[in-house]
Amino acid sequence: ADDINPKEECFFEDDYYEFE
């Protein structure tokens, strides 16, 4: 999770993308 939707500051995982 690096270049994803940084809409939240909780995407420091490998499978933590909250974008649908």
UniProtKB/Swiss-Prot annotation:
Keyword DNA damage: no
Major localization listed first in the record, in broad terms: secreted
Top-level taxon: Eukaryota
GO BP: apoptotic process; defense response to bacterium; killing of cells of another organism
MF terms (GO), sorted A to Z: L-phenylalaine oxidase activity; toxin activity
Tissue: Expressed by the venom gland.
Presence of keyword Oxidoreductase: yes
Catalytic activity, EC: 1.4.3.2
UniProt catalytic activity: an L-alpha-amino acid + O2 + H2O = a 2-oxocarboxylate + H2O2 + NH4(+); L-leucine + O2 + H2O = 4-methyl-2-oxopentanoate + H2O2 + NH4(+); L-phenylalanine + O2 + H2O = 3-phenylpyruvate + H2O2 + NH4(+); L-tryptophan + O2 + H2O = indole-3-pyruvate + H2O2 + NH4(+)
GO CC annotation: extracellular region
Function: Catalyzes an oxidative deamination of predominantly hydrophobic and aromatic L-amino acids, thus producing hydrogen peroxide that may contribute to the diverse toxic effects of this enzyme. Is active on L-Met, L-Ile, L-Leu, L-Phe, L-Trp, and L-Tyr. Exhibits diverse biological activities, such as hemorrhage, hemolysis, edema, apoptosis of vascular endothelial cells or tumor cell lines, antibacterial and antiparasitic activities, as well as regulation of platelet aggregation. Its effect on platelets is controversial, since it either induces aggregation or inhibits agonist-induced aggregation.
Family label: Belongs to the flavin monoamine oxidase family. FIG1 subfamily.
Subunit structure: Monomer. This is in contrast with most of its orthologs, that are non-covalently linked homodimers.
Annotated protein name in UniProt: L-amino-acid oxidase L1
Native source organism of the sequence: Daboia russelii
Origin organism lineage: Eukaryota, Metazoa, Chordata, Craniata, Vertebrata
